[in-house]
A protein has these predicted regions:
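Short intracellular "coupling" helices and adjacent cytoplasmic loop segments at the cytosolic face
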Residues: 236-248
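Cytosol/matrix-facing amphipathic helices and coiled-coil assembly/linker segments
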Residues: 247-260
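Transmembrane-helix signature of 12-pass secondary carriers
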Residues: 1-234, 259-271
Length: 271
C-alpha cells in the first residue's frame, strides 16, 4: 500500500484536482468562514491603537493616549486572549471546529455590544469588560478557523489555501485602520462608534454561515463519526467517488494518527 508523499503524488497524477469544478468552488466558499476568523483577529487586534488617535474617543472616556489608562484598557484584550487559552483546546477538539468558530464569534458580538453601549454612560469599566470578551472570543475563533481550513481543504490545494488564510489577518488589520481613519473626520461620537460596531460584521458572517458548511472530516473521523467523515470526503474531495484515491489517502492519514495517539481524550485537548 502506497502511503505518504507517494500516495499523494499517485492521486495527483491519476485524479488531478478540478479547480473549476462546481464542488471545488463551493468548498472554497465554505472555507471563507474560516478565513473570516483570521480577519476578525486582525480587525480587532488593530482597532484600539487607531482609537487612541481619536480625540473624541479619548474625551468621551476622559482618557489619554499614553500612560496607565491607555495601557490598562489596551491590555484587557490580551488578558482576555490569554484567559481563553485553557478553553480553546476543549472547545474545538471536543465539540468541533464549527462550534469553536461559533462560540468565538458569539463572544466577539457580545463584546462589541458591551463596548458599543458605552456611548450612553462612558463607563471605562464596561469598555474594558467588552475588550476582555473580544480577546476571549478572538482567541477561540482564531484557533478554530485556521484548523478548520487546513483540515477541510482539498489536499492538492492545502498549502496554497492555508497561505492565503494567514494573509486575511492583514486584510482585517487594513480594514480596521481604514475604518478608523475614515470615521475620524466625523468629529462626533460616531467617529469611534462606527469602527467598534464594525467588529460585528465578520463575526456575524461566521455565526450565520458556520452551520451551513461541512464539519472538518478529520475531526469527525477521530471522534468516531467515521461514516460521516467518509461521506464528507467523498462529496468534497472525491467528487462523489467513494473509492477516490484522495479519500483513501486521507483515511489512511487519520488511521495513522489514531494508531500513534490513540483515542482523543479530554486532557489531550490542552496540549
Amino acid at each position: 500500500v502506497v502511503t505518504g508523499s507517494g500516495a499523494f503524488n499517485e492521486a495527483l497524477i491519476q485524479e488531478p484536482p478540478k479547480l473549476s469544478n462546481r464542488t471545488t468552488i463551493l468548498l472554497f466558499l465554505c472555507l471563507l468562514v474560516g478565513f473570516f476568523c483570521q480577519t476578525m483577529n486582525g480587525f480587532d487586534g488593530a482597532l484600539f491603537n487607531g482609537l487612541l488617535a481619536n480625540t473624541v474617543f479619548l474625551d468621551h472616556f476622559h482618557g489619554s493616549n499614553s500612560g496607565i489608562w491607555a495601557g490598562i484598557v489596551s491590555a484587557m484584550y490580551q488578558i482576555g486572549g490569554v484567559s481563553a487559552l485553557p478553553f480553546v483546546g476543549p472547545a474545538i477538539d471536543n465539540w468541533g471546529r464549527r462550534v469553536g468558530m461559533f462560540l468565538g464569534s458569539l463572544l466577539i458580538v457580545l463584546g462589541t455590544i458591551v463596548c458599543g453601549l458605552t456611548i450612553t454612560n462612558a463607563s471605562v469599566g464596561q469598555f474594558m469588560g467588552g475588550r476582555f470578551m473580544l480577546g476571549f472570543g478572538v482567541s477561540i475563533a482564531a484557533a478554530a478557523g485556521p484548523i478548520y481550513v487546513v483540515e477541510t481543504t482539498h489536499p492538492a490545494y492545502r498549502g496554497m489555501v492555508t497561505g492565503y488564510c494567514n494573509t486575511f489577518w492583514f486584510v482585517g488589520s487594513i480594514l480596521s485602520s481604514g475604518a478608523v481613519r475614515g470615521a475620524i473626520t466625523l468629529q462626533t461620537n460616531q467617529s469611534w462608534q462606527i469602527p467598534i460596531w464594525l467588529q460585528m460584521v465578520f463575526a456575524g458572517l461566521v455565526i450565520g454561515f458556520c452551520w451551513m458548511i461541512p464539519e472538518s472530516p478529520r475531526w469527525l473521523y477521530v471522534h468516531g463519526k467515521r461514516e460521516k467523515a467518509i461521506e464528507t470526503l467523498t462529496k468534497w474531495h472525491g467528487y462523489g467517488n467513494r473509492d477516490s484515491l484522495w479519500v483513501k489517502l486521507q483515511i489512511s492519514e487519520y488511521e495513522a494518527h489514531l494508531n500513534v495517539d490513540g483515542s482523543v481524550s479530554f486532557l489531550y485537548s490542552f496540549f
